[in-house]
UniProtKB/Swiss-Prot annotation:
Gene3D superfamilies named in the record: 3.40.1280.10
Record protein name field: Ribosomal RNA large subunit methyltransferase H
Disulphide bond pairs: none
Signal peptide annotation: none
Catalytic activity: pseudouridine(1915) in 23S rRNA + S-adenosyl-L-methionine = N(3)-methylpseudouridine(1915) in 23S rRNA + S-adenosyl-L-homocysteine + H(+)
Pfam families (UniProt xref): SPOUT_MTase (PF02590)
Length: 154
């Protein structure tokens, strides 16, 4: 199952960008034997400002995908539950899992409503670059849990 983090905007070179690359590479390598991956980040530029225009740009990357929207009103899941969900989707034959990260104002409510699920990183608001890094790390953590790796400790 391919895993994509589809996000509005391009990140400048930064420590967060390096973290995203590190965890995407780790998740891709660890997931290969489990039928997970590759893991990729797709940066989407919207030609017009606003949530509706951003949603239209994001929709171009969602065909045939199980979509989870990163949204502050979503469910915050423990890492094991997150891993179990990814494993369950893989076992159900989902070929592509997409996590959506919106722009500075979040995702368009209509796009969130169309998603198969919503994910939150708790009640706080996080900077865009950190949200990407945290999601990439959690995807890697989920893959390592499914692989039985000692990376995650309860």
């Amino acid at each position: 199952m391919r895993i994509s983090i589809v996000a509005i905007g391009r990140l400048a070179r930064s420590p967060e960008t390096e973290l995203v690359k590190l965890y995407v590479e780790r998740a891709t390598n660890a997931g290969r034997a489990l039928g997970l991956g590759p893991v990729e980040v797709v940066e989407v530029e919207s030609r017009k400002p606003g949530k509706a225009a951003e949603a239209e740009a994001l929709r171009a990357h969602l065909s045939d995908a199980h979509v989870i929207a990163c949204d502050e009103r979503g469910a915050a899941r423990p890492s094991r539950a997150f891993a179990e969900e990814i494993g369950r989707l893989r076992d159900q034959g989902v070929r592509r899992l997409v996590f959506l990260i919106g722009g500075a104002d979040g995702l368009d409510p209509a796009l969130v409503a169309q998603a198969n699920g919503k994910l939150a990183f708790g009640p706080q608001t996080w900077p865009h670059a950190l949200a990407r890094a945290m999601l990439a790390e959690q995807v890697y953590r989920a893959v390592s849990i499914l692989a039985g790796s000692p990376y995650h400790r309860d």
